[in-house]
Structures are given as C-alpha cells and as structure tokens.
Amino acid sequence: MATRQRESSITSCCSTSSCDADDEGVRGTCEDASLCKRFAVSIGYWHDPYIQHFVRLSKERKAPEINRGYFARVHGVSQLIKAFLRKTECHCQIVNLGAGMDTTFWRLKDEDLLPSKYFEVDFPMIVTRKLHSIKCKPPLSSPILELHSEDTLQMDGHILDSKRYAVIGADLRDLSELEEKLKKCNMNTQLPTLLIAECVLVYMTPEQSANLLKWAANSFERAMFINYEQVNMGDRFGQIMIENLRRRQCDLAGVETCKSLESQKERLLSNGWETASAVDMMELYNRLPRAEVSRIESLEFLDEMELLEQLMRHYCLCWATKGGNELGLKEITY
C-alpha cells in the first residue's frame, strides 16, 4: 500500500526539449480535448475522478452536442478496451498512442482491469506536463506506487517507467525512436497488445500513418488497433471542420484517408491488419443502452438534434485485429 513516504519517493530530473513549431497546433488539441472531457465529467456525463488533476474546469460552457459526442467517444473506446481485456483475461499490454491527459490507466485500476502493463506515448512537451501532475498529486502517484515493486520510482522530464505503467515522450513519426523507448520500458512483443489512437492518425500524412499501422501490425503476433477520428470529410460540413482547424494552425495532414468508413477500413487492411470494422458515431450513439441515453439527455437541453447528427456522422470508431484466433480477437465488436 502506498504511503505518504512512498508518494514522496517519486523523483524527477528536469530536462528541456525543442519541439517543432509546426506541431504546436496539434499539441493544442490535447488541451482542447482535456477541457471538453473535464467539463462533461463535471456535469455528470460519466465518472472520472482523475481528470480534475490534469486540467482545471473551464469557465466556458461546452455545447451539449460536444458533451454528448465526447460521451459517445469515451463509452465506445472503453467498451472495446474492456472487450479486449476480457478476451485476454488482462494478460496483455495496452499502448495508448497520443494519450495526452488520458486517465484510462487509473480508471481501469479502480475496476481491477489493468493489463500486464499500460504504456502511453505523446509529444515530449505533453509528457513533461503530465508527469509533473503525476509527481505533484498523490491521487495520481499513489496508484502507480502501489503496483511498483521498488521503493523509489525514477522519472525524468520525458519518461516514467514502473512495473505496470509507463509514459514515454516520443514522436510517432519516428518509429525507430518509438520502438527503442517502448522496449526500454519493457514492452513485450509476445504479449497480446492493444494499440489505441484517438484523433492522432489524421494529423499525420497518409504515408506516416500507414508506416505506423504497418509497424504495429508487424511488431505483434496478436494485436488489436482502435482508431477514433474524423470520417465523411468530403462534404460541406467536413470542409468547414477542416477550415476551422486550419485557422487555428492545425492542419489535418491525413484527411484524405477520412473520406468514408470504407476508406478507413481499407487503410487498416492494406497495412497488415487481418480484420477491420468501423461505425460512425451516430450509429454508435444509437446503439447505446436506452437507459444511458435517457440519463445523459436529461442532463442538459439540446436545441437542434440535427447538429448533433451532423457532428456524429463526421467521426468514427474503427478497430482492427491480427492473429489471436485462440483468444477470439476477431469476435470483438461494439
């Protein structure tokens, strides 16, 4: 059990890094997503006692359609993660690519559903910020220390490695660096592995995201990949989304792969994955348990259902599998 003494035994060595200025807009999406999740949690969309330790509650109220969209996203990704954990009986590892301020590790621990090891990867600048929060806030550090076999836990500005949890600062476009750092933190390529990318691939060029998907498929014999991002971006609504992001210096470099659900599945299948499925978020929303829908729709009034539908039709949840027939990975669905 973690104690105050053990909490204080997390030590850090500060270091600096130079980040490409062109990535500033992409890094800014981490803050946007964290603020949106924090607000949705604050009004009761889902339970997450950890997000408050990474981001302050914004004074700006988020629109109801945004809150419902984030609820569907969190619910959908969570259901697929738990399905993978059940199939593997938690004898597996999870690699969250572009994790930002994600709190899945802590929430899975609370549900006694932790994999053998949970890895997070993001830009070094984002990782530095996350590690600072972990170091300074016992509700975040204590669960890590409880699972760690040693009395002290070393971390520097860009990496934390413990028995069950690791955070790595790396550029997903540099696969040799990514693999080297993951292996340094004891990533086991023989274990069934779930990789997660939420609004990550779309900020990479099609070639870069294809290389990442191929690397993932080639690195693990039994694996699953979850991808959440834009879809149906060729219509007028999609073009407006692209223009709005460009005005914020955030270019969707990989938007051409987001034409349709079919193009999303084809990308996965053409880069080493054996099965691929995809649903847009409106379809996913319509599949939610009716009791949950009634609960969240009672939280706040939504003027225009059409706006929610437009938004949800332009995001999708995709998942792909490779190997793992004996585990039933191909049977995983939403």
From Swiss-Prot:
It holds the Pfam family LCM. Keywords: Methyltransferase, S-adenosyl-L-methionine, Transferase. One of its GO terms (cellular component) is nucleoplasm. The lineage of its organism: Eukaryota, Metazoa, Chordata, Craniata, Vertebrata. One of its GO terms (biological process) is negative regulation of protein-containing complex assembly. Coiled coil: none annotated. InterPro entries: LCMT1 (IPR016651), Ppm1/Ppm2/Tcmp (IPR007213), SAM-dependent_MTases_sf (IPR029063). It catalyses: [phosphatase 2A protein]-C-terminal L-leucine + S-adenosyl-L-methionine = [phosphatase 2A protein]-C-terminal L-leucine methyl ester + S-adenosyl-L-homocysteine. The gene is LCMT1. Belongs to the methyltransferase superfamily. LCMT family. S-adenosyl-L-methionine binds at residues 37, 73, 98, 122, 171-172, 198. One of its GO terms (molecular function) is protein C-terminal carboxyl O-methyltransferase activity. Its EC number is 2.1.1.233. This is Leucine carboxyl methyltransferase 1. It comes from the Eukaryota. The keyword Methyltransferase applies. Methylates the carboxyl group of the C-terminal leucine residue of protein phosphatase 2A catalytic subunits to form alpha-leucine ester residues. It comes from Homo sapiens. It is an enzyme of class 2 (transferase).
